[in-house]
Amino acid sequence: MSKDSLTALVWFRQDLRTEDHIGLKKALDSGLKVIAYYTFNPRHYQNLSWGFKKTDRFRAHFLVQSVRELKESLKSMNISLIIDSKPPEIGIIEYLKKYQVRQIYLQHEWTEEEKKEEQAIAKKIDTSIKWYRHYDQFLFHPNDLVFSRDQIPEIFGIFRKKCE
């Protein structure tokens, strides 16, 4: 397989921007063809056990606008954005195969739902596909904290003073 036929995929989830996006920059630096993926995950639009949706109409409208802007921004970089409406552990698998994806770039998430999605995908794909996760959503990188995760203050003012 020639390097020209191999692809890097940037998986957009909560990080719908192109400026200062570490994963996107690293994918572009990889030398592989780059495509992007976003799904309007149907689970986000279902009623939760608390009786409301994780994503209701105002947030959905905002997401549609954000994804539209992301698509235009990526287009100006000559990158196609695949917009899907399947759960990622189903939808993304199809595109990994179709585009011979060898590298996946994504924001490192820590919540249970995102971790389960990643684990479900990892179980279904070729182990030669490399995952590149990055922290891109914090004021402070977790490795730069001067205390352990279980010692993080619950009040931001105290947290800030410990970090200064």
Label each region the model flagged.
Residues 1-164:
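Trp/Phe/Arg-rich N-terminal binding region typifying the photolyase-homology
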